[in-house]
């Protein structure tokens, strides 16, 4: 168990759990879908019948496909995720950016998210892989950012033999879970030199874990980039696409 998760669990014991806000997901969808320039909106469905938004952009020809997972309380076209889902198509990767579970706008604490939203987050990541695989898209990679990277880590803990052949992990606070040390897929860990303190301070722990990951795993620190890689998305997209080209051959 990582130190962050340990403190999160302690915090959960002290505060009431927050509720997932499906209404807010609908409002976010109504806000972003009319403004989409690249990609087609579609609905995916969980086993419980709950629909959630995804934005699909097909590369022609496609070298592979990437599922993108955004951070806390935002949407699948938000800032760095929105930029990457479009830029990766230009590099030959079909993208599927999915809406992750959100809380109400007044939820500010990290501990509100874990474990309340993680089970459905894990399922949505699995559903996205199934949808792409059913349409013949392969190989698959998962790209996550910020809180989405914790959700992705939780997904891989629950699905060690998942269909994702690679993981691009952006802006993860702290270190990877212990299960990641036995990862069967290469990992690209990317952060900014001006990232959040918890991301910067945890870089050595993530770098140590990558020593136990498969060949091709590496850590990249983008100089002068902040947590959202503002103004650096072009450089970030090149780092990601070049790495995918190498490990998904």
Go through the PLM ranges and name each one:
Residues 14-17:
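N-terminal signal peptide c-region/cleavage motif recognized by signal peptidases
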Residues 20-59:
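N-terminal cap/lid segment of alpha/beta-hydrolase-fold proteins
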Residues 51, 58-97:
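Short, surface-exposed "cap/lid" segments of acyl-processing enzymes
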Residues 72, 99-106, 225:
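Short beta-to-alpha linker loops that shape the active-site pocket of alpha/beta-hydrolase fold enzymes
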Residues 80, 109-135:
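Alpha/beta-hydrolase active-site loop
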Residues 130-185:
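Primarily recognizes the serine-hydrolase "nucleophile elbow" in alpha/beta-hydrolase
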Residues 161, 165-229:
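The feature captures the conserved acid-bearing segment of alpha/beta-hydrolase catalytic domains
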Residues 216-249:
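C-terminal catalytic histidine-bearing segment of alpha/beta-hydrolase fold enzymes
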């Amino acid at each position: 168990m990582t130190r962050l998760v340990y403190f999160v669990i302690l915090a959960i014991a002290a505060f009431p759990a927050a509720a997932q806000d499906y209404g807010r997901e609908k409002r976010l969808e109504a806000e972003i879908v009319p403004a989409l320039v690249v990609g087609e909106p579609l609905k995916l469905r969980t086993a419980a019948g709950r629909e959630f938004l995804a934005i699909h952009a097909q590369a022609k020809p496609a070298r592979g496909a990437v599922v993108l997972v955004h951070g806390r309380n935002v949407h699948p076209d938000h800032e760095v995720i929105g930029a990457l889902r479009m830029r990766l198509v230009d590099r030959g990767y079909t993208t599927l950016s999915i809406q992750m579970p959100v809380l109400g706008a007044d939820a500010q604490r990290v501990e509100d998210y874990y474990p309340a939203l993680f089970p459905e987050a894990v399922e949505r990541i699995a559903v996205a892989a199934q949808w792409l695989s059913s349409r013949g898209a392969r190989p698959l990679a998962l790209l996550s950012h910020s809180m989405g990277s914790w959700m992705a880590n939780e997904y891989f803990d629950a699905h060690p033999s998942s269909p994702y052949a690679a993981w691009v992990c952006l802006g993860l606070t702290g270190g990877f879970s212990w299960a990641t040390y036995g990862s069967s897929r290469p990992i690209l860990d990317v952060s900014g030199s001006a990232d959040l303190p918890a991301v910067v301070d945890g870089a050595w722990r993530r770098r140590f874990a990558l020593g136990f990951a498969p060949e091709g795993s590496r850590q990249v620190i983008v100089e002068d980039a902040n947590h959202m890689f503002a103004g650096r998305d072009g450089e970030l997209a090149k780092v990601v696409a070049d790495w995918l080209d190498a490990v998904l051959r």
